[in-house]
Amino acid sequence: MNFKYIVAVSFLIASAYARSEENDEQSLSQRDILEEESLREIRGIGAKILGGVKTALKGALKELASTYVNGKRTAEDHEVMKRLEAVMRDLDSLDYPEEAAERETRGFNQEEIANLFTKKEKRILGPVIGTIGNVLGGLLKNLG
């Protein structure tokens, strides 16, 4: 009788331990899934913000371009117009990152691709903002 009791208790302890190990593995995988979902949400929010900024910049640049097109242009104005056109092309290239990704990132893993796009956006948006500042400064100087 004592032997049967010892075997039964040992079996219960072993099954409880196995269930706790299984629950630990499930909670880890659920935690990983939740972390991945939160990262996707953060990326989605960032993409929406960046999209809004790009749309606003495009609108401002189109307005500036139409102002330059309708008036007489000096050589300096012509140079500024060329810069604006280049900035517009750069902003348009940000709208189709999938095509750029296929050409530029073959063989990279997902993290390297994300870092590449972040660097590319910084590389493009930095000069864009500088150019817009210069254009607005030039307009204010010409108007004043």
Swiss-Prot record:
Q: Which InterPro entries match?
A: Bombinin
The primary location reported for this protein is secreted
Residue span of the signal peptide, if any?
Answer: 1-18
Keywords, ordered alphabetically: Amidation, Amphibian defense peptide, Antibiotic, Antimicrobial, Cleavage on pair of basic residues, Cytolysis, Fungicide, Hemolysis, Secreted, Signal
Subcellular localization is given as: Secreted
| Family that this chain belongs to | Belongs to the bombinin family.
The UniProt entry's GO CC annotations, sorted and at most eight, read: extracellular region
UniProt GO BP: defense response to bacterium; defense response to fungus; killing of cells of another organism
What is the name of the protein in this document? Maximins 7/H6
**Tissue specificity statement from the Swiss-Prot or TrEMBL entry:** Expressed by the skin glands.
Q: Which Pfam families match?
A: Bombinin
From what superkingdom does this record's organism come? Eukaryota
Name the coiled-coil region(s).
none
- Role of this protein: Maximin-7 shows antimicrobial activity against bacteria and against the fungus C.albicans. It has little hemolytic activity. Maximin-H6 shows antimicrobial activity against bacteria and against the fungus C.albicans. Shows strong hemolytic activity.
Which residues carry the post-translational modification Asparagine amide, per the record? N70
Question: Which residue windows are transmembrane per the record?
Answer: none
Positions carrying Leucine amide? L143
State the organism named in the record. Bombina maxima (Giant fire-bellied toad)
Q: Which residues form the propeptide?
A: 19-43, 74-123
